[in-house]
């Protein structure tokens, strides 16, 4: 729903949703068909191959919403906010591109803040309670997970990273 809402609000901007799992992707494609959004496409793929799909400097912004936390330390490089992934994002993002990340998982968020720095990126904005941060919450498009976790009383963390 997140990317569908963005596509509806910004018909002159193209969006590409990437999803690893077919079951999740199927629901998104059905929603896209229902809403008739010509500026929205989906790709089923593992994000590790992102540089094989997008050209250097092709992408304006990357949204990472409630990603799998891969809680075991040995799986840290699989996290979409690891420095290994920021190396990939560095290739496909335009010079002034940015990465926006939201989660309710505080350990993952703390890891991500450190990885942004270790990757040589800068934090443009950081909040540990998005819905009580008037500046960062302005224009926030909520995901289904965000609604669920927020309703359960979990604060939502958000960062915006730039090169």
Segments predicted by a language model, with ranges:
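Conserved beta-strand positions in the Rossmann-like core of class I SAM-dependent methyltransferases
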Residues: 16
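Class I S-adenosyl-L-methionine
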Residues: 112-163
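A short SAM/SAH-binding and catalytic strip from SAM-dependent methyltransferases
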Residues: 53, 59-80
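S-adenosyl-L-methionine
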Residues: 28-61
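A short glycine-rich, Lys/Arg-flanked "PGG" loop and its adjoining helix->strand segment in the class I
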Residues: 79-98
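Conserved class I S-adenosyl-L-methionine
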Residues: 71-76, 98-119
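Conserved SAM-binding loop of SAM-dependent methyltransferases across substrates and taxa
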Residues: 1-12
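Conserved SAM/SAH-binding beta-strand->alpha-helix loop
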Residues: 21
């Amino acid at each position: 729903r997140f990317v569908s809402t963005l596509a509806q609000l910004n018909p002159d901007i193209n969006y590409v949703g990437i999803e690893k799992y077919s079951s999740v992707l199927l629901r998104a494609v059905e929603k896209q068909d229902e809403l008739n959004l010509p500026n929205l496409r989906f790709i089923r793929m593992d994000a590790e191959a992102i540089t094989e799909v997008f050209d250097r400097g092709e992408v304006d912004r990357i949204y990472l919403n409630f990603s799998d936390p891969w809680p075991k330390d040995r799986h840290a490089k699989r996290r979409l906010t690891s420095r290994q992934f920021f190396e990939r994002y560095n290739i496909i993002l335009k010079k002034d591109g940015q990465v926006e990340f939201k989660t309710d998982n505080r350990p993952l968020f703390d890891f991500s803040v450190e990885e942004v720095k270790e990757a040589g990126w800068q934090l443009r904005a950081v909040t540990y309670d998005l819905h009580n941060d008037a500046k960062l919450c302005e224009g926030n498009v909520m995901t289904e997970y965000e609604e669920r976790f927020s309703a359960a009383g979990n604060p939502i963390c958000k960062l915006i990273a730039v090169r």
